[in-house]
């Protein structure tokens, strides 16, 4: 992975002038891409494949949280969602017992933050900002979530900086929840899959538990419209799955 020159970062790890300009350009590109994407019905949670994938992911995430003993800590946990969108996962954590005042969501798109504030409990904190610098967020977090954020970033040093910030804001016994795809989409030049090796590079000296999940969307979308049962059966065949759901912990 390409590493930025030493002058790109300040002594405390914050972006320097070179990185800041590069990150701003990449952030503008991402905003433009996702502003258009939000208009596509294929990404609606009411689309059958999206709905089934969401249900599968929710079940697997709850199992993972229980595996690491986090299910009993949700009520007191401070949770940060990086790239929170409309706040769907923060709402789920509230449903699972999290206290809204302990939850924070950030997103690059102001319209997503506006939507999140309109549909989520008012005690949840939402900020429209880049994840490359989280110094304005008070305190540390027990859980940091990211969902298809890293595959949306094409600038390697920006990915590294966000990973560093997520780790910096994570408590020593906390966990990062990772959900992203590992297979490139030849039809979409605006994203890039992230394989296990790159995840390890982004989070060195961490314990990483990844499981394959989510039936490949080009296959799953037409099947889900015909048969939910067939979709679920095929999603159990791991070579057909395109995403990783995982837990990342500090050593």
List PLM regions with ranges.
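Class I SAM-dependent methyltransferase SAM/SAH-binding core
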Residues: 80, 86-133
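Conserved beta-strand signature within the Rossmann-like core of class I S-adenosyl-L-methionine
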Residues: 173-180
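A short glycine-rich, Lys/Arg-flanked "PGG" loop and its adjoining helix->strand segment in the class I
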Residues: 160-172
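A short SAM/SAH-binding and catalytic strip from SAM-dependent methyltransferases
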Residues: 143-157
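A short acidic, Gly/Pro-enriched loop at the edge of an enzyme's catalytic core
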Residues: 132-144
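A C-terminal cap/extension of S-adenosyl-L-methionine-dependent methyltransferases
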Residues: 197, 211-251
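Conserved alpha-helix/loop element of class I SAM-dependent methyltransferases that forms part
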Residues: 54-75, 92
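N-terminal, positively charged/glycine-rich alpha-helical extensions of SAM-dependent methyltransferases
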Residues: 1-44
């Amino acid at each position: 992975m390409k590493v930025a020159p030493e002058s790109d970062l300040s002594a405390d790890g914050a972006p320097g002038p070179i990185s800041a300009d590069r990150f701003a350009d990449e952030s503008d590109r991402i905003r433009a891409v996702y502003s258009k994407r939000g208009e596509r019905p294929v990404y609606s949670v009411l689309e059958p494949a999206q709905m089934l994938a969401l249900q599968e992911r929710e079940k697997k995430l709850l199992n993972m949280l229980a595996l690491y003993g986090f299910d009993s800590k949700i009520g007191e946990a401070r949770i940060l969602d990086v790239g929170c969108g409309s706040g769907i996962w923060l709402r789920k954590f509230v449903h699972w017992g999290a206290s809204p005042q302990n939850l924070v969501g950030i997103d690059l798109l102001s319209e997503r933050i506006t939507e999140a504030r309109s549909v989520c409990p008012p005690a949840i904190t939402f900020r429209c900002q880049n994840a490359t610098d989280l110094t304005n967020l008070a305190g540390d977090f027990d859980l940091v979530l990211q969902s298809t954020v890293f595959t949306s970033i094409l600038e390697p040093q920006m990915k590294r900086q966000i990973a560093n910030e997520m780790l910096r804001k994570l408590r020593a016994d906390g966990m990062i929840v990772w959900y992203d795809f590992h297979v490139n989409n030849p039809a979409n030049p605006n994203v890039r899959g992230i394989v296990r090796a790159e995840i390890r590079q982004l989070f060195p000296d961490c314990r990483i538990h990844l499981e394959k999940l989510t039936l490949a969307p080009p296959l799953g979308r037409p099947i889900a419209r015909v048969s939910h049962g067939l979709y679920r059966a095929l999603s159990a065949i791991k070579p057909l799955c395109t995403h990783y759901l995982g837990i990342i912990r500090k050593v």
